[in-house]
Amino acid sequence: MASALEQFVNSVRQLSSQGQMTQLCELINKSGELLAKNLSHLDTVLGALDVQEHSLGVLAVLFVKFSMPSIPDFETLFSQVQLFISTCNGEHIRYATDTFAGLCHQLTNALVERKQPLRGICVLRQAIDKMQMNANQLTSIHADLCQLSLLAKCFKPALAYLDVDMMDICKENGAYDAKPFLCYYYYGGMIYTGLKNFERALYFYEQAITTPAMAVSHIMLEAYKKYILVSLILHGKVQQLPKYTSQIVGRFIKPLSNAYHELAQVYSTNNPAELRNLVSKHNETFTRDNNMGLVKQCLSSLYKKNIQRLTKTFLTLSLQDMASRVQLSGAQEAEKYVLYMIEDGEIFASINQKDGMVCFHDNPEKYNNPAMLHNIDQEMLRCIDLDDRLKAMDQEITVNPQFVQKSMGSQDDDSGSKPSSYS
């Protein structure tokens, strides 16, 4: 091993044993070029360092190995990274979160390139757990995990990191930018859409769309298109975006989504035939955007919406008559829709198989059973917790030096603009 590398190993050992992590971070940041020049000796360096005791040194070496233009032995490197992430010292790597996250990004890109996304899901879950200060902290690795879960069509492992409400962002030594934030909410929305949890999907798309922005983001544009479709499926209309949404959305993103706005407009007429014609008209656009599956679900939801409207007019109705009124192909298709809607709790009805009549019923829920009371109790606890968090955030902002300085400056400007009362 070259003398410069020996010095690097000795410095890593010494600084690690002394607990001088800040100085160690400075060392590994300066040593990238040295390590890159000695690629053939890096496995020897890894052998001389202990993963648990010298986590930052091992991280620096693995990061450089993954940065190579071509990786000669990917399987060995993957095993080394897998072992490192599972056994490294979490307290140590939090001093170099930018490099640790960078290693995870490199791993993700390599697995995507090799079409092996499933292999990285468990590794990235461990990486997030090592890096997070708490379960409500968002890291840039979250977006990597969601990307691999989508590509592998393996959604459930990511749900543990999607079902929590994020309250904080890991700054990653200043390296965190908007892209992983947008990707987390966009990919998360796609995962929830795939699981047909449309309410949560809509929330995630909204977070991506309403991110403060000064320029058009392709991720925001794609999230906006899916937001329109999921809104129609869930609510039968496009939900109004919050007032704090960036002007970029109205000025640039909406004009780039004309086909989707046309779809929403035709959907509001409750005419399936017109909607089918519009889908045929913009078939190429919807297919290119990979949204044809959602568009078909919009058409299906319009049939359901029209069936729900019938429940407000009729007490009983034949399946054939229902099919005619909502423009379905026949009684058999109408029966299929009614059975699915009964199963999902979208309508309350029964079908008489003898005469093919559908009887509509009132909602049997009386809101007085123990399960319902438990749900209400849980919602109240969530509201109390949210109120406590808002108060804590408000207090944190109130004592923030930048906020105090800015608010005092505003007060000075206001007092300076007032006319003097003295003559």
UniProtKB/Swiss-Prot annotation:
Which SUPFAM superfamilies does the entry mention?
A: Winged helix' DNA-binding domain (SSF46785)
What is its subcellular localisation?
Cytoplasm; Nucleus
Q: What does this protein do?
A: Component of the COP9 signalosome complex (CSN), a complex involved in various cellular and developmental processes. The CSN complex is an essential regulator of the ubiquitin (Ubl) conjugation pathway by mediating the deneddylation of the cullin subunits of E3 ligase complexes, leading to modify the Ubl ligase activity.
Protein name, per record = COP9 signalosome complex subunit 3
Q: Which UniProt keywords apply?
A: Cytoplasm, Nucleus, Signalosome
Concerning its family, UniProt says: Belongs to the CSN3 family.
Q: Which GO terms describe its cellular component?
A: COP9 signalosome; cytoplasm
UniProt xrefs under Gene3D superfamilies: 1.25.40.570
The leader peptide range reads none
Domain (PCI): give its ranges.
197-365
Instruction: Say which domain of life the source belongs to.
Output: Eukaryota
Q: List the disulfide bonds.
A: none
Provide the residue span(s) of the region labelled Disordered: 403-423
What InterPro entries does the annotation carry? COP9_N (IPR055089), CSN3 (IPR050756), CSN3_C (IPR048621), PCI_dom (IPR000717), WH_DNA-bd_sf (IPR036390)
Subunit-structure text: Component of the CSN complex, probably composed of cops1, cops2, cops3, cops4, cops5, cops6, cops7, cops8 and cops9.
